[in-house]
UniProtKB/Swiss-Prot annotation:
Name the record gives this protein: UPF0154 protein lp_2061
Organism: Lactiplantibacillus plantarum (strain ATCC BAA-793 / NCIMB 8826 / WCFS1) (Lactobacillus plantarum)
GO CC field: plasma membrane
Cysteine-cysteine disulfides: none
Keywords in alphabetical order: Membrane, Transmembrane, Transmembrane helix
Cellular compartment(s): Membrane
Amino acid sequence: MTVSTGIWILIVVIGVLVGLTGGFFGARHYMQNYLKQNPPISEEMLRSMMMQMGQRPSEKKLHQMLNSMKAASKNDNK
């Protein structure tokens, strides 16, 4: 039972396309669930955290904290 080269190429191309499509949607689903469970911190969340700690949040202090958190996350990813 011999299968021609053209059919093998077609099977491989279809397999690659199915794998890429499945991988894309799998990664997309994973990231959506991850962001739902671990939302990125926003300025409002930071403001409410500072108020709960008894601090009066100024805009300058908020931006300093946001920038330091962004810098720390960049260093963690390296």
